[in-house]
Amino acid sequence: LDPDEFNSEYIHVYPNENVGGAGGFTRGILESISAEDFKATHVLLMDDDVMVLPESFIRTYSLLALVKPQYSERYVSGAMLYFEQMNLQHEDVGYVHDDGSYGPNKRIMEMHRWDCVFENDEDVDFHEDSYAGWWYCCIPVKKIDRSHLPVPLFIRGDDVEFSVANHAEFLTLNGICIWHKGFANKFNANLELYMVHRNSLIIQAMSGICKDIDFIKRIQGFFETEIRRLAYNNCDLLLDAVEEFCAGPDFMKTPQGEQIMKSHAAKNEKMRPVAMVYSKPVNFDSVYKKEKKQLTPTQKWWYQVTDNGQKLPDWFLKKDYTAVIAYDWFDDPTKEYFAEQVLAVSPFDHTAYLRKRDKQRYQQLKQRYQRVMRYYKQNRKQIEQMYQQAAGTLQSESFWREYLHMPEAKK
């Protein structure tokens, strides 16, 4: 944005380096609570790649103007709807599930239906580890602690930590919402397998939140799934998450998030039009359907114990058989059982990546897995202490001002 084009009595553009969502949101928070020409009561945080209607701002202002004192310190959490299916609400308040995944407190709401509109505005009991996504989140200034600002994670997890660590409570209202692209049909292994898991471990260690959740167990489960689907790059990303967490918090002291993102994005499988990687016809409608005839208990045992035949001689495999599977979370071991190769398909844009068995890569990943997990278990307490000790610095106003090249706070 050109500041000269937008700066006015009511708008001020603050140029910022690419320091990710965490850096941008923290800059906005600090500028808002430090402004001398007006006294902000709330700070509204929003993603820059969403579609929003003026009605959301009108309703937010009206809600805050009418709110009773006992609710005045609650976050106003705007809902996220799918840009690709604009009637579907994904989430207004999310929470960290017991298995370490993240998702909505409510079911998916079809907001063109009257019953969903009514249900969506009913009182609900929020889970203990609930959070407001920063695609649209309005935070009371009195709930912002200058000594506990966001964790400098670049992207993913900063909003979760801020809500949970600050024991946030929430207000939601139909019509306070945005539409976001990409959530409905785009899987990014770099973000979902590396960034989310690395940051989950960091915010848990740094702030002591989500104590009962075993994120390592979740990572181990994904590693087993991905290596059996011949997704060697995905396994690399999972191990990168643990390895870089174990290296400690020093990487967060300087703005290098963009460089880290690019280096790990290079490990994403390069999806190409199906016809360029596979000559036979593909039934895209069946990609997200499980096979009617599932594996027998004996077949499941062989699948798991041999990591889908990777510990066996090649003559055990189904020769000339290419399994067509989903490229994302969806998993049906029956499809890829002892397949010679696997075609990971995105039916949304008809692209695919052909995975081929590589026993050398398989062995390297298994050895790395053992090494990384052993190091984590042996050093977990010391690693967590490093993050706890760094929290006071990394979340302080003085750190963030230096990080963002802002002037020192006026005393």
PLM regions with names:
Residues 180-198:
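Nucleotide-sugar-dependent glycosyltransferase catalytic core
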Residues 37-51:
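Short beta-strand-to-loop acidic/aromatic patch adjacent to the donor-nucleotide binding site
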Residues 55-104:
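Conserved donor NDP-sugar-binding/catalytic core segment of glycosyltransferases
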Residues 16-35:
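Glycine-rich, basic loop-to-helix element that forms the pyrophosphate-binding segment
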Residues 198-411:
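Terminal low-complexity segments of carbohydrate-biosynthetic enzymes
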Residues 1-14:
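Acidic donor-binding segment of Leloir-type glycosyltransferases
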Residues 107-136:
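A recurrent flexible, glycine/aromatic-enriched loop bordering the glycosyltransferase active site
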Residues 132-136, 145-164, 169-178, 188-191:
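Donor nucleotide-sugar recognition loop
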